[in-house]
């Protein structure tokens, strides 16, 4: 069986192959997972090839939203989110899921319930974070982005879809939970004063992002990009293979790949 992660600039940078191949070996499953750089214009062609050659694949930047329209079926939560990061190939049909959202919910829902949540970003990961925060019954959800208009459009879409108040904000906002749903790792993207939890989707080139270091300095609980990568990857393997993988093995493989 063959699996892959697709995106741009993922070959040699994504830790997913190391993580999944270590897991497959531990599970005794004869499978190989690779990273494939797929430009935007080649996405439709790749998907046709995937139907015949892959058992499943992960989707990362910049395809998480675009891929949805090419799939044969999409799980209800992923459809509501408007983004897919995990695809199962079943009888040559492409079925989409969002394990970014379910991973974040699994790891952080207890912190988000009744809390003010700030999400940085407006792409596929931000959509997953918005869904997880709403599902966890956050008290208030704010979204900020370098391009304010994108944050505003996303806030409006989710507010209408889920009948919950979601606000786009321009400036710094204090929140109980702060989530960086961008790949930015070397800059301060939000105010952490007053936060009890910081979540970071970024792990390349290191999970010790500038924001993670700031959170640790302030004594704030951290869920970093490796934690999220492992959890969403474990949930993806359960979808593909129907098994519960060993997350400890997966995390060890990621840390070794990153040289940590």
From Swiss-Prot:
**Which domain of life, per UniProt?**
Archaea
Signal peptide range:
none
UniProt keyword terms in alphabetical order: Amino-acid biosynthesis, Aromatic amino acid biosynthesis, NADP, Oxidoreductase
**Catalyses which reaction(s):** shikimate + NADP(+) = 3-dehydroshikimate + NADPH + H(+)
Question: According to its UniProt record, in which pathway does this protein act?
Answer: Metabolic intermediate biosynthesis; chorismate biosynthesis; chorismate from D-erythrose 4-phosphate and phosphoenolpyruvate: step 4/7
Query: Where along the chain is shikimate bound?
Result: 14-16, 60, 85, 100, 203
One Pfam assignment? SDH_C
Q: Locate the residues binding NADP(+).
A: 121-125, 145-150, 201, 225
GO BP terms in the entry: amino acid biosynthetic process; aromatic amino acid family biosynthetic process; chorismate biosynthetic process; shikimate metabolic process
Q: What is its EC number?
A: 1.1.1.25
Question: What residues make up the catalytic site?
Answer: 64
Bilayer-crossing residues are: none
One GO molecular function term of this record is: NADP binding
Provide the assembly information.
Answer: Homodimer.
User: Hey, which family's this protein in?
Assistant: Belongs to the shikimate dehydrogenase family.
Report the protein's function: Involved in the biosynthesis of the chorismate, which leads to the biosynthesis of aromatic amino acids. Catalyzes the reversible NADPH linked reduction of 3-dehydroshikimate (DHSA) to yield shikimate (SA).
Q: Write the protein's name.
A: Shikimate dehydrogenase (NADP(+))
Protein source organism: Pyrobaculum islandicum (strain DSM 4184 / JCM 9189 / GEO3)
What lineage does UniProt assign to this protein's organism?
Archaea, Thermoproteota, Thermoprotei, Thermoproteales, Thermoproteaceae
